[in-house]
Structures are given as C-alpha cells and as structure tokens.
C-alpha cells in the first residue's frame, strides 16, 4: 500500500478529518480527547453500515483490528487502513511488529505508550483536538496535530554533536565537526541516545542530536522532554542521512526530485518497514557504478570533496549551524 489517504469519519455530532501517508500512524494524548470515540465509530459503521448513522469517506477500506483472533484477521486483510486501540495488548508484541512489517496495510494505532518494536516516524505522531463547529452545523470538528514540533529552532552553534549510529552519516558529520573544532560522538544506536544524554546532564555546552526521524518515534517522548527540560539539547531529525543527500540535489536527477516531492506515492509499505530503508536503496541504486557510489556502512570519501560536502551542508544549514 502506498500514497496519501484522506479519512473522514462523521455522524451528526462529530466530524473527524485527517490524512495519513505512512504505514504506521500513532495517535497519542490524554483521556477525553476523542481517540476511543473514533475507533468506536469505525467499528459501529463496520457492524451496522448506514444504519449506524455514521459516514466514512476514504479511498481505502477502514477497519478495526481487535480481539483474540487478531493474527488471523490481520493475515487476511490487504489494502486496508487498520485502526487499533491501546487496550489491545498485542500491539506490544514482537509478533505484531513482524506482521505489520509484512503487511500491505496502513496502521493507525491509538496508544499513550511508546511501541519500541515498531519503527515509526516522529512526523506521524499526532494528538486530536476539537477545532470548533463544522461549517455552521452542530458537529464538533476533530483534527490531528503533531505532538512534537517539526521545526525546532536549531540556530545555536553546537559545541558537541551526537549522531545516532556509526554508519556513513556519522563519518560525514565527524569529518565536518573536526573541521569546525566540534566534538562528534556516536550513540551506537537510537535506543542508546537517551542514556548518553543522561551522562551529559551536568554539562552546559550546546549539544545537537542527529538521528533518523523516519524511525525514532518510540524514543521521541524521552528525548523531547529532556531537550525541553535542559534547554541546551537540540534535536535535528531528518528522515535519514540518505534523505539529506538525495534532497540536496547533489545528484542531478529528475526522478529523484519527483520522488522527494511526494515520497508517499513511491514507497510501498509492504516492501519498506520504514522510509529510511527506501531512501537508502534509492541512493544506492542511483549512485551504483558512479564516483558517488554509496554504501551505508562506510562513507565514500568523494562525499567529503569540497563541492560535494558543501552541497550537502547547504541543504541542512537552515536546520543546524555547522
């Protein structure tokens, strides 16, 4: 499944309207914000159809997954937008993560917990809020909003950079940092970033964390709270290092530009568990047999040649001051 899908769920009192474009969307938030009501309305429509007094507008079937038979039900669903409430304990199981990975459905999961088995994007974590009455009717209009701000102010110059892993992205930022006399360290994986920051709690220097936004959703709650609490910690969360290169126009390729404009139209959810994997394959394929041949595990030195290095840097200068 791929593409952006608009969903409208409404009755004579409530009107939910939102769009989803990735395989996993998370809806968080406090009680009494309408999350469970949304699930109930979709369930009622599935059971009663028009007799429920509920209307659903979407170009894909919307269904609720729940109960003890969830595995069998999920295996038989294809091309659906599947809604799941947090009361279903199976969303925390590794088996569920494996079935999501192999599925060609989109999933909208309502949960206040962080689901560490799933690589969901920081951009697809939402809350629900009532934005008033709908078009002069008595309907309450429910919309989604991003829980975490996507455009953090990173204008300060970092004195230390922490990169998520030890792959090509780390090698690139380490080389840039050395030129700028900035300390650059690897956390050794996204799950280790918070622990590394905990060890630096007493420090007052400006720290910038660089991690793949495409999959860091489960860790975001703790990282964001720490960045707000400390003030000297900033989060730079592009989709991935490969995304930075592809969107820098270092490769003058029209197809790449078209893909980067609307990636959701090209990324098949059953093939790519997270968008980061798609961007890696795209960059590897597009640079194969060229002087810019890309390997995720080790940086090709040509990316550090002055012209290439600056092209990439110019793409991130509005996000991080290096």
Regions inferred by a protein language model and the residue ranges of each:
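Conserved P-loop NTPase "ATPase switch" module shared by AAA+ and STAND
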Residues: 67-94
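Acidic, divalent-metal-binding catalytic cores of TOPRIM
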Residues: 88-89, 122-322
């Amino acid at each position: 499944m791929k593409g952006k899908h608009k969903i409208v769920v409404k009755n004579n009192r409530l009107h939910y309207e939102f769009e989803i474009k990735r395989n996993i969307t998370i809806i968080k938030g406090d009680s009494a914000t309408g999350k469970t009501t949304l699930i109930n309305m979709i369930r009622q429509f599935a059971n009663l159809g028009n007799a429920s007094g509920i209307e659903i507008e979407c170009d894909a079937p919307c269904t609720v997954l729940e109960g003890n038979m969830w595995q069998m039900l999920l295996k038989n669903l294809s091309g659906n937008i599947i809604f799941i409430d947090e009361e279903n304990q199976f969303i925390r199981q590794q088996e569920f993560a494996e079935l999501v990975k192999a599925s060609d459905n989109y999933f909208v999961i309502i949960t206040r917990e962080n689901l560490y088995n799933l690589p969901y994007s920081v951009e697809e974590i939402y809350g629900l809020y009532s934005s008033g009455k709908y078009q002069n009717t008595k309907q309450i209009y429910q919309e989604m909003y991003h829980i975490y701000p996507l455009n953090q102010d990173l204008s300060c110059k970092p004195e230390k950079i922490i990169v998520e892993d030890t792959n090509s992205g780390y090698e690139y930022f380490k080389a840039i940092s050395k030129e700028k006399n900035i300390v650059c360290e690897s956390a050794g994986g996204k799950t280790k970033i918070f622990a590394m920051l905990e060890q630096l709690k007493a420090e007052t220097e400006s720290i910038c964390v660089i991690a793949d936004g495409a999959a860091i959703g489960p860790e975001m709650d703790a990282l964001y709270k720490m960045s707000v609490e400390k003030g000297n910690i900033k989060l730079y969360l592009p989709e991935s290092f490969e995304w930075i290169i592809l969107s820098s126009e270092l490769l003058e390729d029209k197809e790449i530009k078209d893909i980067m404009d609307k990636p959701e139209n090209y990324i098949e959810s059953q093939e790519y568990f997270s968008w980061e994997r798609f961007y890696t394959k795209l960059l590897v394929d597009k640079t194969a047999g060229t002087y810019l041949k890309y390997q995720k595990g080790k940086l090709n030195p040509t990316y550090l040649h002055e012209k290439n290095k600056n092209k990439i840097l110019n793409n991130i200068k509005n996000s991080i001051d290096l």
